[in-house]
Amino acid sequence: MMVCQGFTIYVVMTKANAVSGFLPSTNGLHFANRWEPGPTVRLGILDPRLVGVGDAKSGLCGGMSWFVRERFETGQPIPADATAPANGSPLFKAIVRRQIMSLDWMRIPLRFWRAAAMDPGALVRRTVEAEWPRIRAEIDAGRLVMIGLIRHHGTNPMQLDRDHQVLAFGYETESPTGPTTIRVYDPNWPDRDDISLQLSTVGFRQSTGEPLLGVICLR
């Protein structure tokens, strides 16, 4: 804020940053997070879908985000496939392995569950005051960061597949606590460089219209 000849002038200081060299259209997978029904893994003769888990049709957003980050950080080319690989193919198995890694021995689903169970207002405050600064620090350090999008409120663990994982690579913010735009690679929207999350102290939105109640920094 500045005062000049009796007038109060508010100056908005905008800061922007992004991971150098990363764009979803170039470095992201070129197919959408849409998979045919089928088991992601088998436990011996057991099909895990019989107990309500492990169906590819529920999505592999965590594995896709992890795969993209790993390829970028190691300088490996991204596969040119424009359609999701078949169940059991080498690329499918590679993404599934990283999906399992993204769950961090089930610690990540627990974090999603805790966030979804929070009072909505408390989740907004936690996102702005705790999670967003961690995301920003990772990007400022030049690192892609996986983040979780909370899209439902409640305590039913069977609803966790409504939530989502994406990869943040840039931001623009007007102050340490927002309003803020986070640029993301979203596995549901391949080859799009314009997907973003808008955060403020009064609520959140995703540029593609999906509900967004909160954000958590994963790793």
Where does each model-flagged region fall?
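Short, positively charged and aromatic/hydrophobic N-terminal segments
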Residues: 1-2, 7-10, 15
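Active-site-adjacent substructure of cysteine-protease-like catalytic cores
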Residues: 124-184
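Cys-His-centered catalytic/binding microenvironment captured across papain-like cysteine peptidases
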Residues: 158-163, 172-219
